[in-house]
Amino acid sequence: MAEVDDRIELDWDALEVGETFEKFEYLLTQEMIDTYRKGVMDPEASFPTIAHKVDVRQYNNRYTDAGSVNARCAFHCYNPPVAGKRLTVTAWIADKYLRRGKNYIVTEAVSVDEDGRLIDRVITHELKQPSEVGKKWGG
């Protein structure tokens, strides 16, 4: 039996800045850290949390849309996460704006560990009309 997709179709006009998503929790394992380090070819890489796209995971669980193009992303890393600790990610709509007739949303996500240590903050600007990419060059 097919799974029902109960996500909401994104209505950019109705989207509210400040909307907070359900918290996402996961256990960061040593295997996750090792896989990340292998992927970035750095045996001492400290922030595997950025590899999981936890900043937009909860948005994607709530909304469906035509896709997006990352316009800008900022990662602020504070304390390296520790294997075996449970991480909680809180994400929200931080902003939305119209630029050159195109709709953008800004999601912000903060990760903390089970001890309350701030791990990272990720701010992502997304163009919510991916079909617009390349039009200025005749694409």
Task: Identify the residue ranges that each predicted region occupies.
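Hot-dog-fold acyl-thioester-processing enzymes
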Residues: 1-72, 133-139
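HotDog/MaoC-like acyl-thioester-processing domains
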Residues: 2-4, 81-139
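Short structured motifs
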Residues: 8, 71-78, 92-93
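Well-ordered beta-strand positions in beta-sheet-rich domains
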Residues: 25, 74, 121-125
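Short glycine/proline-centered loop/turn elements that form peptide/ligand docking sites
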Residues: 55-57, 72-80, 87
